Amino acid sequence: MLGDEKEGTSTIPGLNQIQFEGFYRFIDQGLIEELSKFPKIEDIDHEIEFQLFVETYQLVEPLIKERDAVYESLTYSSELYVSAGLIWKTSRNMQEQRIFIGNIPLMNSLGTSIVNGIYRIVINQILQSPGIYYQSELDHNGISVYTGTIISDWGGRLELEIDKKARIWARVSRKQKISILVLSSAMGLNLREILENVCYPEIFLSFLTDKEKKKIGSKENAILEFYQQFSCVGGDPIFSESLCKELQKKFFHQRCELGRIGRRNINWRLNLNIPQNNIFLLPRDILAAADHLIGMKFGMGTLDDMNHLKNKRIRSVADLLQDQLGLALARLENVVKGTISGAIRHKLIPTPQNLVTSTPLTTTYESFFGLHPLSQVLDRTNPLTQIVHGRKLSYLGPGGLTGRTANFRIRDIHPSHYGRICPIDTSEGINVGLIGSLSIHARIGDWGSLESPFYELFEKSKKARIRMLFLSPSQDEYYMIAAGNSLALNRGIQEEQAVPARYRQEFLTIAWEEVHLRSIFPFQYFSIGASLIPFIEHNDANRALMSSNMQRQAVPLSRSEKCIVGTGLERQVALDSGVPAIAEHEGKILYTDTEKIVFSGNGDTLSIPLIMYQRSNKNTCMHQKPQVRRGKCIKKGQILADGAATVGGELALGKNILVAYMPWEGYNFEDAVLISECLVYGDIYTSFHIRKYEIQTHVTTQGPERITKEIPHLEGRLLRNLDKNGIVMLGSWVETGDILVGKLTPQVAKESSYAPEDRLLRAILGIQVSTSKETCLKLPIGGRGRVIDVRWVQKKGGSSYNPEIIRVYISQKREIKVGDKVAGRHGNKGIISKILPRQDMPYLQDGRPVDMVFNPLGVPSRMNVGQIFECSLGLAGSLLDRHYRIAPFDERYEQEASRKLVFSELYEASKQTANPWVFEPEYPGKSRIFDGRTGDPFEQPVIIGKPYILKLIHQVDDKIHGRSSGHYALVTQQPLRGRSKQGGQRVGEMEVWALEGFGVAHILQEMLTYKSDHIRARQEVLGTTIIGGTIPKPEDAPESFRLLVRELRSLALELNHFLVSEKNFQINRKEV
């Protein structure tokens, strides 16, 4: 339990802090820990000894900048140097050299790493903490069976169980179990020592038979018995040193290494005082665990809740990087051993530099960042996405759970999550509850536990002195923690006598005098995504979950706008995301343009480069716009340039637009949305998207591929944008099918395709005549746009393994269109169904047409009423020119606080603007509006307002797809599935029933034969389409029916059909 030095106020911590602290811990502690484990290596004759001197390790500053690493597809890493010594024992000479061990990828200012030019982030994993856990299950007779499970640091398990005769067994595998006496003897204790170290010796003696006595008569016998049971070996194995080594390796190292966390947990659970540096399971632990199990059987002690956070640990960036370093050093050890023996065999004199290679460390880290499930490509759709990605917690990954095996209890919210893991923010689908998000104030403690801050209240005066404490999940159970009214931000408020509080995972109402701690902030138990939802307390949790996920999918718009109604966290999120450019110290602006800002400060002149039209990995456009003028003085921390989706240093993901909640001719049925053409022509929801197209040139067996403009057999129109080298020119407008890079691949022509003169040359002179095949980079369907960047990456040594890469970046401007997805911040999502002319849209009493029409039936059943509060308050804010920042759970101040706030602001707006329709007492919040087509008022008053609406990345341009011809699956001969493979649309059972219901026999036959898997029929269709004529009908069965027949044959079932003649009833058998 840690106290914060500053008493009283608390600020929101840096939201990237978790990643930075983890990496710092790895560099500061993990590196030295792993390097100091590196053993001294000797040759076979024990003449030469190699060792590392850990104290002098050095990490060199990276040779390239972050921006260059991204641009040139390199890794932003630091070189690791260590001093190494080679000692000749006979002459007692030592040669010491500084050696290069390998590259370690560094963390940048965003909390991410750049590997091969790609931003990657390592997410934190939640694992079962090593230690011992007691549980009980009912057997088939309804009797409780108690077990104790010892979990090692590597996740290996050893189970102790007690049967109805009070005998204790250790289960070493699912089928095999051995007596605890045998296990203790194999670990080195004799019977007398066992009985001296247990609380219930008479129970241990009760199941000691003569056969058992023989087994534990000596340590060797016990080890043999244990080996037989563990390895399921028959016969009579003989005791040997190799047998002991195998047991050590397979059992004791895998299942008995507790680590420092496991040792601490076992000491605490079993009341032991074994030193912390003793990280292996000892016989004393086993006996204490058995004693505890016997106590459980007789009703003493408490069972463990496996899902409580005190029984979990966080495996952070530091632990994962340290594990990889250990793996790399183990490989390096093998390399050094091999090199020493090779040098001695060839009678060479080794030096430390010759023995060590940098390959193991560099390749281990590159493969970790590229292949490990917890290392992911940073999602950079918008600033919020970047920052939330680094704060994820996953139960999945190596040593964790899988989406299929995790049960409901693991996925559910637990009381210990309060203030540590957000109860709202998780993924939807198969991983629901397995991927969570850290709460805003949570941090990772030294023992891998999640800690949450609280204010400590002192006895004499519950208000005078207040100190902040960080509690782990095991500590906060002992305190009464106040919630509800005591959360008031103004501490001067007179607290009520009885307050709601939390104690030992129960929610109670207690007197204020009994409270020990109180929460520090209303947002304390939410993640960043959930904290950005205003009026979240009025929403159903499922809709809040959808909203926190959908805000991460919002596309940065060409002209961003701050939200009128927010929560106050927008500025912090934007700052910590690293998207805006910020002044590192005070100074004066000397020069600004779109590419850089130059300012002087502390006697230096600094130039800050700005990001211009950079592509994110979700194809959104990242761009910085300067916000300071030349000659202005700036302070430290001031914003110099806004990034994508930020305005004035605040997060701005969408637009405040005028919305009406009413049905309109069925065009907003079932979550469809009707919009005005103003949103299209006014570029309100226009976004820029940058796509990357790349092509490689290889050296083939026939010769190198060539980049050229001279490509035969292609129309000049397709080559119009190429320069003299055959690469598309910057700034040119390209359409679908245009050539971006002209490339020819050499190939040897077939004998039959030679011209007569070529054959003569070949026969007389033996000259091989080669031709070329056109393999140009063409712009695919839907890729039209402006070429904004071309990069030709030429790697050293143009071999076939090191190809040249040409990348072309094309920018697209996308207006909002029918089929795009929009959403509010309350889980209210919908698809654009129709774009109406502005004169046909419903209009207000002051003549303004609304921009968007939502369906009111989407609100009551989904219980996301927060959108109505936001909608009305947004209207008041736009009329009064105010912005609101609202903390959640404002009902703690008084009842109906949200409604009172909204109505009072609407009333004031109505008075100030002299518009009585803004607040009408008969139906507050609603207004009479008019049909744009007829000018008549609608029958009922309608809710109108200005909510904040986002455009999501699910856009129709990326989804729309049609297939005329394409590839077929080899087995079923049916079209492939999916847009990326040029696949077809599936006609399933239900679609066939629907077509049958309408009686469209010919369409149905087409669907099931020509367009699907009738091979001969579809070839005939192609022929008749080219030469004309009628399409012949398919006669025999399609390929999928033949496949069914073949599968039945594999089960020895023959399927045939018979023709029975009407005249003589003769049967003609026909094979299918």
Swiss-Prot record:
One of its GO terms (cellular component) is mitochondrion. Keywords: Chloroplast, DNA-directed RNA polymerase, Nucleotidyltransferase, Plastid, Transcription, Transferase. GO terms for molecular function: DNA binding; DNA-directed RNA polymerase activity; ribonucleoside binding. The keyword Transcription applies. Its EC number is 2.7.7.6. It is found in: Plastid, Chloroplast. GO terms for biological process: DNA-templated transcription. It is an enzyme of class 2 (transferase). Pfam families: RNA_pol_Rpb2_2, RNA_pol_Rpb2_3, RNA_pol_Rpb2_6, RNA_pol_Rpb2_7. InterPro entries: DNA-dir_RNA_pol_bsu_ext_1_sf (IPR042107), DNA-dir_RNA_pol_su2 (IPR015712), DNA-dir_RNAP_su2_dom (IPR007120), DNA-dir_RNAP_su2_hyb_sf (IPR037033), RNA_pol_bsu_bac (IPR010243), RNA_pol_bsu_CS (IPR007121), RNA_pol_Rpb2_2 (IPR007642), RNA_pol_Rpb2_2_sf (IPR037034). The keyword Nucleotidyltransferase applies. Disulfide bonds: none annotated. It catalyses: RNA(n) + a ribonucleoside 5'-triphosphate = RNA(n+1) + diphosphate. Belongs to the RNA polymerase beta chain family. NCBIfam families: PRK00405.1 (NF001616). DNA-dependent RNA polymerase catalyzes the transcription of DNA into RNA using the four ribonucleoside triphosphates as substrates. In plastids the minimal PEP RNA polymerase catalytic core is composed of four subunits: alpha, beta, beta', and beta''. When a (nuclear-encoded) sigma factor is associated with the core the holoenzyme is formed, which can initiate transcription. This is DNA-directed RNA polymerase subunit beta. It comes from Capsella bursa-pastoris. The lineage of its organism: Eukaryota, Viridiplantae, Streptophyta, Embryophyta, Tracheophyta.
